[in-house]
Amino acid sequence: MKKILIRIVVLVLVFAAAVFGTSKILGKKMADTSEVMAQATFPLVYVDLNGKQINCMHGYAQEMDVIAMRDTLTPLSNDKTVNIQIQPFENQISSVSYEVLSADGSKSLENTLVTTLGKQDDYVTAELKVNNKILINTEYIMKIKVTAGVRDIYYYTRIINQANLNTENYLNFATGFYEKCLNGNDEDGMISQTIEPNEDADNTTLAHMDIHSSGAQLMWGKLTPQAYLKPIPSIKELNENTATLEMDYVITATGDTEEMEMYHVTEYYRMRYAESQVMLLDFERDTNEIFDPENSILVTNGIRLGINSRVLTYKSDTDKKYFAFAQQGSLWLYETGTKKLTQVFSFLQNGKLDARDIYDENNIRIINIDSSGNMTFLLCGYMNRGKHEGECGVAVYTYDAATTSITERLYVETQEAFSLLDKDVENLGYMSADRTHFYLTLEGSFYDINITDNSVTEQFSNLSSGCYVGSSTGGKFAWLQENKKYDSSTLNLRDLETGNDTAFTCDSDERLQPIGFIDSDLVYGVAKVSDIDTEDKGSEVFPMYKVLIVNSAGEILKTYEPDGCYVIGGSVNDKLLTLDRVKKTKRGYTETSQDHIVNSSADDEAAYGFAYVESDKKQTETILKTGETIEEGTTPQILYAKQVKAEGEEAAEVSIPAQKQTEELYYVYAKGHLDSMYTTISEAVQRADDQLGVVVNNKQQLIWERGNKQTTCKLDISTFPDVILSGKMNIKKLSKNLGKQVLDLTGCTLDSVLYYVSEGTPVLAKTADGVVIIAGYDQYNTILLKPGEAETYYYGLEESADMFEAAGNQFVTYFDPLEE
C-alpha cells in the first residue's frame, strides 16, 4: 500500500511538472506571438487664450506635410505670442521648440527653442513668441516640437496676426450655448433668441440637430445627459466678420432600458459679431453612441446600435451568418445562431476615456468577410495608440475567427493627413486573396505593394481627378488611358487578382468617362463629342447618352439609355447607383430628376440591413437587422480579439513620401473639415458658398471665404492693369499680361465674386451688351466701369445679379495675395 501511495505521489508530481513546463512553454509562445495594444502615451497640447483652454493638438511621431495640416487656427496675442499648456500624462517633458512656416511649408521664418518651461497644476506651460516679422491677415503654420523622454513629437496649428477678431466673444457664446443646452436651462432666452426653428427640421432624432431644430430638442429632449468629458473649443476659421468653431465632448445618460450609456458629441458653430453681440449664423450637432456590449444590445430582429448620426456600413458573408460593423473607433463581429459578439479592434482605452480616445481622425474599412467569419479590414488615418501611435497611414489587418485574433499584415506610413488620406483609400485599398499584394491609390498615383518583400511599385502616376476609379471590395481598378476627363476614348479595367486588363473603347465621335463600381462591376458612360461642352472651365458638361455596367470579362451586364435627357455623373452607395441627369435646352443643359439602378444581387432589406425604431428618451435608434428572430432578454457571448504576429513573420512596413502636386486643386473646407476637392476654382467656390466654407489652393493660401467681405467697397480704377481695363476675358492673354493666377469664376453668383472686389481685385463680367468691370459695391448697388471709359456708374444689386445671370454668370478675376 505504501509503495502504491508513493507511486501515485510520484505520478502526480511528474504530471504537475509536465503541466508547469507545458504552461511555461505555452506562456512563452503566447508572449512571443500575442500583443496587447499599448495605451495612448503621447501628450496633448492646448492653447491658453487668456485663461481659456482651446485648440487641443494631437501629436505626430514624425514631421508631416504641412500642406495637409489644416486643423485649428490660433490668433496671436498683441505681442505675437502663443501660450501653450502640455498635458504630459506619464511623460517627462524635457524641451519645447517651435518653427513658423509659410502656409505651404516652403519657407521657414523662424525656429526657436523655448528656454524656460513652467508648471501649472498638471500641465507644463510654455510661451511661444513670434519674433520675426510676419504679414497681418495672413495664415502661417506653427510647428511645435515637444521632447517627451527620448521621443520628439510634433504638433501643428495655423496662426494669424490680426486685430478685431472678437475671439473671446465667440468662445464665450459657444461655451454658454453648450452649457445651457446640457443643463436644459434657457431662462434668459439665449437659445430661443438665437436659433431659427422651422417646420422642415426633424425633431424626432437626437442623432443630428441644427439651427432649425426646436429649443426643446437642442436641450436634449427627455435624455437629461451629464458631462463626462467637457468640450475644448477648436477654432477652425476666424476673420474680422465671422468665426467657425467646433467642440467635441462626451456625455452619459440613462436610456430607455435604464442602463448608463455614453455618447460622443460634435458641435459646429458659425457666428458673426455685430452691434456688440454674437449672432449665430449656423449650428449643427452630431451625436454618436459609443457601443457597449454589456448593455441590452440584442433586440428581436438584430443589434441595437443606438443613436448614430453617421452613415453606418456593415458587411456580411454570403450566407448572412456573420455581420461586421464599425462604430466609434471599434470594429465588431456578430455571429448569428451562437450570438457571439467579438470586439475585433478598438482604439478606445481601458478605463477612463480622455481626449485621445474620441479623436476620430481615422476610419475603419471592412474589405471582406468569408463564410467562416474571417475578415480583412483597413485602419486608415491617425493612429491613436499602439505601436504606430502618432503616425498617419494605412494598416491592413486580417481576423482569424477560429483563434479570435487579428494580425497586422502591412503598415503604409504616409505624410498625408487623414482628411486627404481617407479620400484616397476610399477610392482603392485592396489586399489580394493570397495576402501577398496590397493596392492603393494615393495623391494621384496607383501603387502595388508587395507584402512579402516590402517593395513598392508605382504602377501609374499623375492620374487626373475624374480619370480613375477603384473597387476595394471587388478588387478592380479602372483608368482612362489618355488621362483626360473630357477627351478619352479608352477605359482600361484591371483585375487585381489576375493582373489582367480589359479595354473598353468607343466610336471616334464618342468619349468615355468612368462613374464607379457596384462591387466588382464597372459603371461608365458614353457621350457624343458634339454634345460635350468644355468652353467654360469649371462648368464643363459631359452629357452621357448611355451608361453601361460591365464585368472584367468585357461582358455588358446592363445598358441604360435615358429618353430625352443625359447623365452627367453618378454615385454608388453599396448596391444602389444614383445617376444625375440633365435636359438639353436652347440655353444649354438644365438639371432634371435623378434616376436609380439597383444591382440585381441587392439584399432583401426587409430582413437585413439598417432599420430605425422609436423610443421615449432616445427618440430614434438604429438597428442592424441580422435576419433572425432573437428572444427577448438574450445576451450575447462577448469575446475580445487578441493581436498576434504571424508565425515567424513581421508585418510588412513601407513608407510612401509626399508627392509633389502636379494638378492644380482647390480644397473646400466647411464646418471644420475638408469637404471636397475640385480642379476648377468656380466649382470650389460654388460648393464653399453652399456649405458656408472657404477655399484654399495647393499652397494652402486662402483663395475665397464665405461672408468675409466689407459692407461697401470702391476700388481706385487708376490702379487697374491695362489688360483689365481693356475688358478682354481671354484667360491665356490675361495670364500672360498680369503674371498672376487668373480665376475663371463662371457659374458663381454675383455675391460670391464680390469677395474679390472686397479684397481689392476688379472682376470682369459678361453682359448681353458686352463686358463690364466690377469696380466696387455698396449695400444697394454695384459700381461698374465700361472698358474704354473713365467714369464708373452705379447699378442696382438685384438688377446686376439678373443681368449677369442672363449672360451665364461669366466672371473672371485674378488672385493677388500679399507677398512676403
Which residues are covered by each model-predicted region?
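N-terminal Sec-pathway targeting helices
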Residues: 1-15
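Extended, charge-rich low-complexity regions and/or helical-solenoid scaffolds
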Residues: 490-492, 502-536, 540-575, 580-582, ...
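Short loop/turn segments that connect beta-strands within beta-propeller blades
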Residues: 336-339, 401-402, 450-454, 495-499, ...
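Core segments of small alpha/beta cavity-forming domains
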Residues: 36, 40-101, 106-108, 139-223, ...
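Beta-propeller fold detector
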Residues: 110-113, 283, 341-350, 406-414, ...
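Surface-exposed, charged secondary-structure patches
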Residues: 20-30, 67-83, 94-123, 127-144, ...
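A short hydrophobic beta-strand element
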Residues: 140, 237-251, 373-379, 522-527, ...
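Conserved active-site-adjacent core of cysteine acyl-enzyme catalytic domains
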Residues: 712-820
